[in-house]
C-alpha cells in the first residue's frame, strides 16, 4: 500500500498517535506524517504510506493555512487554551476592527518568533517541553518565519468584553508557531493573549475538504477498499515543476550519479520532479 492518506486529524490525539492508528488499521509497516499538529489542533495531516514515505521531505516544507481564534485578556503557559493562566488583564476598552487589521498588516511578511517553552524544539539536547515540565525556563533561539496572509474573519466593527475573541485565517511558512503569533497579536494590541482554537485547513496543495476521518479509514479497511483513499505518489508531487528525462539519464539519476545540469534546467530554483517516459518520477532538489 503506497500513497498519501489525507487525514482530518481529530483533537485530543498526537500526530504520532494518528500515524500509529493508521498503521494498525491498514496493516502497513512504513508510515509517517509530513508536519506535526499539536494534540488540541485538528485538521489536515498528510500521512505517507509505504514507498510514499520517500517523498515526505518534499511535502513538509510547503506552506500551511490555519483558521483559529485569538483571545485577549489572558496569557497561558502553553500559549493556548490548555495551559495555566500566567497573566490576566481585563480588556478595558473597545477594540476596533481597523486596529486589529493594522496589527495583522504589521505581522505580515517575514517576522521573528521565539518558540514557546511547551514545544519540541531542542535546546542543549533536550526538547523545550521537557524543561517546561520541570519548571525550568531556558533561553530559546529565535527563528525567522514568513506570514503570507493574515485575515480577520469576524465581521464586527467593534469588540467588547473583559475578554475579547476574534477569528482569523493565516497562511504561513513551515515552522511558524501560530500560538506564538496569537500572543504577538495580543502584545501589539496591548493585552495578554493566547490561541483559543485552531484548525489546519491546508497543507501545501492538500485541503481540508479532501481529507478523510478515522471512521472512513475503518470502514474502507473493513471492506478492503482502503487503497481508494490514497493519493498516488505522482499526484502528491503535482505541485512541483516536472521535467522529462530519457531512460539513459534516468538510470544514472536512479543510481545517484553526479550529472552536469542540462541547459534547460540551469535557471531552475527550488525543488522539482524528474520523470522518464515510462512515468516513473523522482523528486529532487
UniProtKB/Swiss-Prot annotation:
It comes from the Bacteria. It catalyses: uridine(55) in tRNA = pseudouridine(55) in tRNA. The keyword Ubl conjugation does not apply. GO terms for biological process: mRNA pseudouridine synthesis; tRNA pseudouridine synthesis. InterPro entries: PsdUridine_synth_cat_dom_sf, PsdUridine_synth_N, tRNA_psdUridine_synth_TruB, TruB_C. GO terms for molecular function: RNA binding; tRNA pseudouridine(55) synthase activity. Keywords: Isomerase, tRNA processing. Its EC number is 5.4.99.25. The active site is at residue 38. Belongs to the pseudouridine synthase TruB family. Type 1 subfamily. Responsible for synthesis of pseudouridine from uracil-55 in the psi GC loop of transfer RNAs. This is tRNA pseudouridine synthase B. It comes from Geobacillus kaustophilus (strain HTA426). The gene is truB.
Amino acid at each position: 500500500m503506497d500513497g498519501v492518506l489525507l487525514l482530518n486529524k481529530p483533537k485530543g490525539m498526537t500526530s504520532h498517535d494518528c500515524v500509529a492508528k493508521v498503521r494498525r488499521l491498514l496493516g502497513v509497516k512504513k508510515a509517517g506524517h509530513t508536519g506535526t499538529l499539536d494534540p488540541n489542533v485538528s485538521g489536515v495531516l498528510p500521512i505517507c504510506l509505504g514507498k510514499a514515505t520517500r517523498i515526505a521531505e518534499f511535502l513538509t516544507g510547503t506552506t500551511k493555512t490555519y483558521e483559529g481564534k485569538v483571545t485577549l485578556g489572558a496569557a497561558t503557559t502553553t500559549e493556548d487554551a490548555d495551559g495555566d493562566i500566567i497573566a490576566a488583564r481585563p480588556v478595558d476598552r473597545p477594540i476596533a476592527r481597523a486596529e486589529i487589521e493594522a496589527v495583522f498588516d504589521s505581522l505580515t511578511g517575514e517576522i521573528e518568533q521565539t518558540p514557546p517553552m511547551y514545544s519540541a524544539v531542542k535546546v542543549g539536547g533536550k526538547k523545550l517541553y521537557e524543561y517546561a515540565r520541570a519548571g525550568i525556563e531556558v533561553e530559546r533561539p529565535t527563528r525567522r518565519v514568513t506570514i503570507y496572509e493574515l485575515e480577520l474573519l469576524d465581521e464586527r466593527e467593534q469588540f467588547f468584553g473583559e475578554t475579547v475573541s476574534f477569528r482569523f485565517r493565516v497562511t504561513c511558512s513551515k515552522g511558524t508557531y501560530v500560538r506564538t503569533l496569537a500572543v504577538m497579536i495580543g502584545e501589539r494590541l496591548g493585552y495578554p493573549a493566547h490561541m483559543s482554537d485552531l484548525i489546519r485547513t491546508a497543507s501545501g496543495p492538500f485541503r481540508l475538504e479532501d481529507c478523510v476521518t478515522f471512521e472512513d479509514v475503518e470502514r474502507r479497511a473493513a471492506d478492503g477498499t482502503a487503497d481508494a483513499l490514497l493519493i498516488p505518489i505522482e499526484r502528491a508531487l503535482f505541485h512541483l515543476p516536472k521535467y522529462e528525462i530519457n531512460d539513459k539519464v534516468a538510470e544514472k539519476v536512479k543510481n545517484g550519479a553526479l550529472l552536469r545540469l542540462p541547459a534547460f534546467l540551469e535557471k531552475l530554483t527550488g525543488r522539482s520532479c524528474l520523470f522518464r517516459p515510462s512515468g516513473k518520477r523522482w523528486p529532487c532538489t
